[in-house]
Amino acid sequence: MGNILTCRVHPSVSLEFDQQQGSVCPSESEIYEAGAGDRMAGAPMAAAVQPAEVTVEVGEDLHMHHVRDREMPEALEFNPSANPEASTIFQRNSQTDVVEIRRSNCTNHVSTVRFSQQYSLCSTIFLDDSTAIQHYLTMTIISVTLEIPHHITQRDADRSLSIPDEQLHSFAVSTVHIMKKRNGGGSLNNYSSSIPSTPSTSQEDPQFSVPPTANTPTPVCKRSMRWSNLFTSEKGSDPDKERKAPENHADTIGSGRAIPIKQGMLLKRSGKWLKTWKKKYVTLCSNGVLTYYSSLGDYMKNIHKKEIDLQTSTIKVPGKWPSLATSACTPISTSKSNGLSKDMDTGLGDSICFSPSISSTTSPKLNPPPSPHANKKKHLKKKSTNNFMIVSATGQTWHFEATTYEERDAWVQAIQSQILASLQSCESSKSKSQLTSQSKAMALQSIQNMRGNAHCVDCETQNPKWASLNLGVLMCIECSGIHRSLGTRLSRVRSLELDDWPVELRKVMSSIGNDLANSIWEGSSQGQTKPSEKSTREEKERWIRSKYEEKLFLAPLPCTELSLGQQLLRATADEDLQTAILLLAHGSREEVNETCGEGDGCTALHLACRKGNVVLAQLLIWYGVDVMARDAHGNTALTYARQASSQECINVLLQYGCPDKCV
């Protein structure tokens, strides 16, 4: 059986004839291999087609019978090889394949009026070695090609598309020229139609062009093309506005915040064990804070950010001497004298005021003689020299890497400038807030002036500088260390000079004092020897644990029929601070959270906030009262604090998460 080639004619393809040779040459892009069941040889189809001189004029008055409107003899339909008109085209050795393909393609076009077969728009002509030389094959291709416009015109009326999902297009036909290339290959160029062609398996795409006409300056055909709006602006858009869009976009990045001094993309090494480098968008602001984001979008939205306080940090550059180490006052004798050369070789030098000129000012005489091992380590460290490190006062390290040396030096210099500016602004802020510091000093002085606060509450050491918040007492530094070992449940230690003191804490300390506290915690210490300033730490610790942890010296409760919780409610309502402290020292968490009777549901915290007494409210919270508790009316303690207009109570309750809304 001969080798088979197929040529599919599409409506978007026009033909050209050579007036001299007249050969019809289908384009190579329109010739494709058959399916897996077809067999194909490498002979080109154009070489098998005999030339013929044909010129066809197609106009508006041209009317042709379409191929599918013509009746086919029954003999040809069922046995094409038996018909003399078709025997030269369809050979007996391929008639089975031809019939099966023709029937499968024409199943949906059977006419109910006439017993004839109608054929699809997309016609397929089968060519093999023995049929490509027939003299009327050229006319067959021309007839099929010229009747395509008639089919498309009639298709709009029937609404019967031969090809599924094919859209309707307008069609106009002008003069069709068919010519053959000199190289023997064919080309089919469309000069008149805008109809999309059916898909082709060819690797080359056909080129379409519209020739100029003599009558009109515009093309003859009216193209109906669907343009993509992917790169076009919307209707009614302002061109000037579009040109200004990039500028406005750059201006709106990070709007509403301080403009960074320096910003850009840097690589940051993760702190996990993988040690991977990821891109981060880093900003450096004038407030001395270095912030890095996962991306530029996160920076614009101000989300997923992490900040580094440069005021308490320093910067290190691998392979660079620290600025303080460049002094000529301290020569380095050997590499084993003080370890500075080791730090230099390993690239861990500290750079506080780095600049390119600083490293060059170091005298070569001061450099220690390098050893072979040191040179090897230094060579290994030079593999990545565009990185720098930021180290905080707590030892946390952030590794960053720039793309070039210049970019790294620019970042290092900018960060060093902000570190220096932050330190200077810290000094200036201290000088500006001298009046506030003086007022705080006066408040702390009032705490020290409380009765008994001139000496340590446990060992009588003079001028104590440490405090226990929930006990309301002052102590020496040695006793404060023992109090810390008790835990915050028993003693909350704070420095009188180093820590901040809000208003509510100052009020608590100014309301209790050492004498009042000792009258409660040492109320039953008769016959016990209290440690002195010269006592050992073991003696002081033994006394403190017996006093606060075991409560051996605690004053007894008053004799009454009321429970401890009811006594606490009454003392809170009467604002009796000394009795309340005694009851809190004896009571448990359940007794502290006891509510008022008669269905009221108020706790001692509700009563303290109703009175606006921040001292009692704070002490109750420290001793375990439920901040989320509500009374019978669904009100929290914050509701009563707002009714009493006590801002101190409101601040304390909000700090501990008290809900604001009623149920």
Swiss-Prot record:
- Enumerate composition-biased segments (Low complexity): 188-202
Looking at the keywords, is Translocase present?
no
Record domain PH: where: 259-420
What molecular functions are annotated in GO for this chain?
A: GTPase activator activity; GTPase activity; zinc ion binding
Where in the sequence does UniProt note compositional bias of the Basic and acidic residues kind? 235-250, 531-540
Keyword annotations: ANK repeat, GTPase activation, Metal-binding, Repeat, Zinc, Zinc-finger
Q: Which residues lie in Polar residues bias regions? A: 203-216, 519-530
Signal sequence, start to end: none
Q: Answer whether the UniProt record assigns the keyword Oxidoreductase to this protein.
A: no
Task: Spell out the family assignment given in the record's similarity comment.
Answer: Belongs to the centaurin gamma-like family.
Task of the protein: Putative GTPase-activating protein.
Provide the protein name. Arf-GAP with GTPase, ANK repeat and PH domain-containing protein 4
What gene codes for this chain? AGAP4
